[in-house]
Amino acid sequence: DGLKPDFFLVGETLHGDYNQWMNDSMLHSVTNYECYKGLYSSFNSMNMFEINHSLLRQFGPDNWTLYKGKHLLSFVDNHDVTRVASILSNENHLPLIYALAFGMPGIPCVYYGSEWGAKAKKEDGDPALRACFEKPEWNDLTTFISKLAEAKKHSNALNYGDFRSVLLTNRQCIFERKTDSERVLVAINADDQPFMAHFDAGCGTAVDLITGETHDFGGGSELAPYSAAYWKMER
């Protein structure tokens, strides 16, 4: 930082305590491979407890959590692993895994081509994983990810907020990101059926940062099938 304060240093790490490399004397951030596995596995096994466990371990409210206040590099695929569109068993989960990656603590990183759902498997080698594209494509997934990026960019809570689990089932999860100035609830429904969520929201209404629509918490919150929301709370 003393030599060039605006030069961001990030390291590629797999296992172990990331604090060994991510600290005031070394790197600003490292790749979050622990949550990479938890992200796709939670959808494929329909077990949101897995990714929630990792997020609580890394960023939860307890004093012992590993990386509270730090910003790991979040990703759902990269140049060394099977592309997420090829690893998910249900294509309806593709937008949702990005909503989870952008909503959780960390710096989301999108691998080129995956923003429109490019497919490739690790067993087919580097040429498949690192393909050349003639031009970018734009589809509904691209539009959705761009909305997630816009929401993340302008939200203090999504960038710097604490992490707290609010509601958790095998197929749904709601967690809170909170700073002194803003509170956002990230809600995911991975099921093919609507889900009525009952919890203490602490306020009456919110605005979904993805759609811009107002959400009323009165009488419960219905999550549509295969849906995600970033509810910015009224207080």
Language-model regions, residue ranges each:
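Conserved catalytic core of Hanks-type protein kinase domains
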Residues: 75-78, 103-104, 151
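Active-site-proximal helices and loops of the catalytic beta/alpha 8
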Residues: 1-67, 100, 117-147, 151, ...
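Short, well-ordered beta-to-alpha junction loops that form the rim of enzyme active sites
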Residues: 13-14, 75-78, 114-116
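Carbohydrate-interacting/catalytic domains
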Residues: 94, 105, 110, 114-235
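Structural preference for beta-strand elements that scaffold enzyme active sites
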Residues: 8-10, 71-74, 108-109
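Active-site clefts of carbohydrate-active enzymes
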Residues: 66-89
